[in-house]
Amino acid sequence: MNRFRVSKFRHTEARPPRRESWISDIRAGTAPSCRNHIKSSCSLIAFNSDRPGVLGIVPLQGQGEDKRRVAHLGCHSDLVTDLDFSPFDDFLLATGSADRTVKLWRLPGPGQALPSAPGVVLGPEDLPVEVLQFHPTSDGILVSAAGTTVKVWDAAKQQPLTELAAHGDLVQSAVWSRDGALVGTACKDKQLRIFDPRTKPRASQSTQAHENSRDSRLAWMGTWEHLVSTGFNQMREREVKLWDTRFFSSALASLTLDTSLGCLVPLLDPDSGLLVLAGKGERQLYCYEVVPQQPALSPVTQCVLESVLRGAALVPRQALAVMSCEVLRVLQLSDTAIVPIGYHVPRKAVEFHEDLFPDTAGCVPATDPHSWWAGDNQQVQKVSLNPACRPHPSFTSCLVPPAEPLPDTAQPAVMETPVGDADASEGFSSPPSSLTSPSTPSSLGPSLSSTSGIGTSPSLRSLQSLLGPSSKFRHAQGTVLHRDSHITNLKGLNLTTPGESDGFCANKLRVAVPLLSSGGQVAVLELRKPGRLPDTALPTLQNGAAVTDLAWDPFDPHRLAVAGEDARIRLWRVPAEGLEEVLTTPETVLTGHTEKICSLRFHPLAANVLASSSYDLTVRIWDLQAGADRLKLQGHQDQIFSLAWSPDGQQLATVCKDGRVRVYRPRSGPEPLQEGPGPKGGRGARIVWVCDGRCLLVSGFDSQSERQLLLYEAEALAGGPLAVLGLDVAPSTLLPSYDPDTGLVLLTGKGDTRVFLYELLPESPFFLECNSFTSPDPHKGLVLLPKTECDVREVELMRCLRLRQSSLEPVAFRLPRVRKEFFQDDVFPDTAVIWEPVLSAEAWLQGANGQPWLLSLQPPDMSPVSQAPREAPARRAPSSAQYLEEKSDQQKKEELLNAMVAKLGNREDPLPQDSFEGVDEDEWD
């Protein structure tokens, strides 16, 4: 063979399309795994959305000028780590997740409803599923990797055929050879292994692949002898290696690229030998031709991307535009779009070029799982890509049979988002579905429900049966109020307050914000005096020690409690007219803790009662009038992340770094009354009582650093959470702000740009998602204001303060209503008077209980909408079509002629030429 042969792909060029051809306005998610995050069949594209456990589904080909619509499929209760389409059935999708299961889904055709439940569930595994792939020759076999374990599954029986020998560390890649006989794995222990799963579970061959243990990936060539690996060398440089399984001790060829941190995703077309390398977080694609005969990795072309790459996938060869010499098509997943990038070989003649498009594997499996396991090595019959030889035989897998169509009168439509028509207005974003389905942890049983991605249907009853309940607050919109109400020119803010603190606090009169200057200074801003602050220094409270948390007394708007790193709590009295000078002497200093204080919480009903948690692992209950701690709670084994009083003030709940949630009755004893499992992650957590004190909501992290919500029954903590809802992956703890009147909770973290909004229910489905609020720049915190600050005339459900880098702005959450002239009593029940105490500290400590007064928010000049007179339905005039249907063709013709004659009329007006003046007779000469 000529060593210096000329490649037929040497002139291959990448052709990014125009923006009109993009699948735009999607919301792709970022995941910590090094998988593709997008896959394609000949009909559909599936990709990770920005909601954990939810995939976006979109057609591969558009229909004329109609925009492609994205449907959302709720697959798992946790992050989807990997996905794969069947090589034989375009509508059979497998998904693996951090919830430790593998699920198989039958996706519908255009205009049909997405499934509400998987057809097959494999697992659960002991660890999150990291890798999965369908078998290339047999329908119903797939390989999956979870932790150090690799299993080969018979999906029809929902049982593993074999479990390969344990690896030395986390398995990063597991792929089938093209003939389906071997499995290759790449592991974090730097070893590349080859298995023959039908012969023995141990590796038949192994070698050191890459010198660095960072992410490594594998891809087989068209034959079983050769495969390609990507990874990092000892110098942290990215490299690609070509291997021959017959000479496995060293690589045939290697290629070193650069020192970028993004892992390389190898997209290898085994028929052409073209390899596209996609680096996550980068803006460039590299294309090489893999030539095992030389051996060599020959560069072909490079493509500069317009946006950052989050994932990539190859389109199957049967879907390529072969008449335009498209030899590859890469789907680039970015944050907001899917960009199809075609690789074309320039040719003069517009015809089918057999040298570029050899026969490829068809879509009919060669064997069944039982025969394959018994040793059958039949290969999939090849088909020609020549359009003149099509269509080819099709195949529908029996693993998940297609669903029977519903009757026309109740057939649902897919919950779709028109791509390119998304609302671009700033302020809020609509959820893919009004129902967010949480999961029950695996120790408690199967998932309670699944987000179906189903949307509107002709019948409201069928909609409710398909979607389940939806929140009446789902259309609430967050809006930043006019700039006249902002406080601007804030300088020197302390943005590094401990994670246990909200960062600032507010009541209806003023805001307290810690400053970065030494001495633990706290600025007090008057909400009644908005505008630009002076450039000069503000009068402050000189705390004397760095501030760890602060809280306003709910019954005295002029008293502020400030906790310091010196284990002391200082109570400050702010003058009624505001802070006009620097205060250095607090009203009271509370001492008792031996370590730095974490959190402060005032009692909701009793005056002068304050709870504090500390790094000394205790919670102390203070009598502020006496200036001493009266109760001390124990039992924590690690740092206390958060504490919260129950609405009736009788119980206190805590969440701790030791992974436990505890409930105390402080007046009954120092030990916890109940104890249950909390979030697994140790990065931070928050706890709040919800649903009239029947439930506890905990926000925290799982073991994969994903932010999640856990809902507990307050009387049964030991049984674990009722439901768990995963949100996203971010470093900051979600801070919950709960409105007991509506059952709505606002959730956001320091440094976030999005505020989640959910309605909480004490029974399934527990979480109902509403519109979230988004902003172009991150905020430093969010604090909910009292209910009396809401403008009920504008149906304002909640008002909060948003702290930015240099300003403080109010945000109102309003519900669109048509008849605003009436008081919306269905969303504004009587609210508790939380600014007046019910008990004294001494009475509460002696065992007394009470209930807060209730106050109506209805203005005196408004009547409730429940008593509004019903509007009579407008009478619709019969359409002309109804009259025409009752007339014969002859009558229609006569009426048409009469109408034309009547329009023209019998006009006797003089003609234009009658008004012309002629010439004299003698002028004719």
UniProtKB/Swiss-Prot annotation:
Upon changing residue 680 to R, the result is: Does not affect ability to regulate the anterograde Golgi to endosome transport
Judging by the UniProt lineage, the source's domain of life is Eukaryota
Give yes or no: UniProt keyword Repeat: yes
| Cross-link named Glycyl lysine isopeptide (Lys-Gly) (interchain with G-Cter in ubiquitin), sites | 472, 680
SMART domains (UniProt xref):
DUF1899 (SM01166), DUF1900 (SM01167), WD40 (SM00320)
**Example GO biological process term?**
protein transport
Map the WD repeats onto residue numbers: 75-115, 124-163, 166-205, 209-253, 542-582, 592-632, 635-674, 728-768
Tell me, what does this protein do in biology? F-actin regulator involved in anterograde Golgi to endosome transport: upon ubiquitination via 'Lys-33'-linked ubiquitin chains by the BCR(KLHL20) E3 ubiquitin ligase complex, interacts with EPS15 and localizes to the trans-Golgi network, where it promotes actin polymerization, thereby facilitating post-Golgi trafficking. May play a role in the maintenance of the Golgi apparatus morphology.
Q: In which family does this protein belong, per the annotation? A: Belongs to the WD repeat coronin family.
Protein name in the entry? Coronin-7
- Biological source species: Homo sapiens
Gene name as annotated:
CORO7
